[in-house]
Amino acid sequence: MKKLFLLFALLVSAVQLSFADSALTSTEFYKAYLDVPIVKAAAERPHHLSEVAKAYLFDETNPLDVKLALINAVGPNPDGLATYGEYIEYCIQHFPKKKYGIAPNKRVTIQDIYKNASCEQMAALVYLYAMNYYSDTESVYGLMENAMQTPLTNKQSFMLPMGLVVAHTASAMNDLGNIYPAINYYVNSPENKDMRPKAIEIVMAYANRYKPYANKQ
């Protein structure tokens, strides 16, 4: 029984270690945006999404690359976070019913949020969800696939979180050979390079650690 328990403990530790070093948890590209007040504030209080931060994410006029940096600064937490749920509730409360033909007395649902989200809004939702629930790789990957079915934009900021999710899933499956190709493709193939070069440098520094594995395939 002791040996069985020890084996289980070792397996759990190995899984936790793999999640601790993944594309979602080990790419702190927010550091390239610390001159932006909203990102700096999030970095100073990680694992918390302020009302100001929620409003920033919700505002479609704000640039997606800064939104991603904000979410990245909030960071992941192995014990779980409430930030995704809190942001969804914010979206529900501030959803423009008239714009989307929803009756004033009808309660907005999470389905309404996703149904009417733009591709950039989907990118922020996917990334925030992934950083909250990164240990649930199946759900995270499924949400990413849904986002990729929306009308896409050929922007680096949209593709970045998708690539991080794909690479994270590969890491969870111990498929090390697909980590570098996934990140390299999703990050570097878009024509619109709207992420800061330093942010991409941070992400690719992580990806390059796995490049030798890709070369073996």
Predicted regions and their residues:
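Short secondary-structure subsegments characteristic of cysteine-rich extracellular domains
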Residues: 139-157
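N-terminal alpha-helical interaction modules that lie
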Residues: 20-115, 169-217
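Sec-dependent N-terminal signal peptides
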Residues: 4-14
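Start-of-helix signal in alpha-solenoid helical-repeat scaffolds, especially tetratricopeptide repeats
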Residues: 64, 119, 124-126
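Non-catalytic all-alpha helical scaffold/repeat segments
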Residues: 116-117, 122, 133-134
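Residues that mark the junctions of alpha-helical repeat units in TPR/alpha-solenoid scaffolds
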Residues: 63, 118, 155-157
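"A position-specific structural signal for the A-helix of alpha-solenoid helical repeats
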Residues: 69-73, 124-131, 159-164, 205-209
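Short coil/turn and helix-start
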Residues: 134-136, 173
